[in-house]
Amino acid sequence: MIKRYTLPEMGKIWTRENRFRKWLEVEMAVCEVQAERGEIPQKAWEHIKQKADFDIDRIDEIEAVVKHDVIAFLTSIAEKVGEDSRFIHQGMTSSDVLDTATSLQLKEAGMLILNKLERLRDILKKRAVEFKDTACIGRSHGIHAEPTTFGLKFALWYDEAGRNIDRLEKSIDSVSVGKISGAVGTFAHLDMEVEESACRKLGIKPAPVSTQIVQRDRHADYLSTLAIIGGLLEKIAVEIRHLQRTEVGEAAEFFSKGQKGSSAMPHKKNPITCERISGMARLLRSNLMTALENMALWHERDISHSSVERIILPDSNILLDYMLFKINDIVENLIVNPQKMLKNLQITRGLIFSQALLLALTRKNITREDAYSLVQKTAMKCWENNKNFKEMVDNDKDINQYLSKEEIDRCFNLTYQLRNVDNIFKRVGIL
């Protein structure tokens, strides 16, 4: 991933230095277990533990000749360890190192993402309570529908963030597995206890069964979860982008001192970070499709997944980490305009209460179809003539023969329409 979108802590997990360091951790965990079992002389193990290290420049030199990164890595270590290096990598295959180390990286990356996701949920909860009773127009198909509250938008996102936390915890657990089972997963030259003990030392679980690799449904599941979380962030970003439109003006990204919105138009304040998040969510979804393609490999393993994962695993984690960092800042500092929300509620001159009127009529021994026709007829006149819907209803003889003035007034009662907001908040777990 390019530097522009890489935060330091997440970026460090996916550096070459850390990648090789994780490889070394795996090799050392296996050697330690084998030494405990008497399979490596204790003196040799102490020497290995003291001397084992790698040199990235030297790895690159060796790989240029041997065309194999794990062999180059092991050769670099051997040059530092000397004769006792013969005990390193005993009974193992390259993917024992690669896949187990990748699991360690994914676990670390997943925990960083989880922390930011939990913070997002906390911010959403705070803002939901803040705007719980702030009335605004609800829209379907982009058209004014019925009143809602701005707090309910945050409550919806809060609830979804909770589901994503559950998903991510499960996906981290699923991908936190190692395999030290040899060339085709049969433990032909290793004892199964070596795998179990080494994985325990590394803080992960052994895969119950493996081939030459850990099966890629685990990685696909993990990237699926990242893409779904990205979908929530895009949902929030798209909503803010719509609400920031000039003709809507209900909410906007914070615009800092000295910030400029356009090279040509000095007046512009654009939702650029939300737009960036929308674009990044597309990348997350495209990476998921590639991860799904990696599941079906030849027999006990081919290498077609390897080149792909060198890109999609770092990039997806780095992207989502950055997206969460940005959306947290956006939501926490979101500029909200309740006055414009109130003004927008009045744009349709009362048409947003048409369903309440329809239902009131159906309770007066009139068919739903006839009631719908009565309300729609008046509503269309309101649209065409720019009239106030309630005033037209008050003077509509066809409607007045069924409903009293008090009954009509009740249909246009905003407070009554929003009477269940507190109950929704309680059900979500915010109140």
Residue ranges and their predicted role:
Residues 1-187, 191-197, 206, 259-262, ...:
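A helix-coil-helix interface module used to build multimeric assemblies
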Residues 16, 113, 150, 218, ...:
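Alpha-helix N-cap/helix-initiation motif
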Residues 152, 220-228, 356-364:
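Short, well-ordered beta-strand elements within core beta-sheets of diverse protein domains
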Residues 1-22, 62-66, 83, 265-431:
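Glycine-rich cofactor/substrate-binding loops
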Residues 33, 113, 117-120, 124-127, ...:
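Amphipathic alpha-helices that form helix-helix packing interfaces
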Residues 99, 106, 110, 154, ...:
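Amphipathic alpha-helical coiled-coil segments and their boundaries
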Residues 195-288:
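Acidic, glycine-rich loop-and-beta core segments that form the ion-binding/anion-interacting portion
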Residues 32, 105-117, 226, 230-235, ...:
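Alpha-helical support elements that line or immediately flank enzyme active sites
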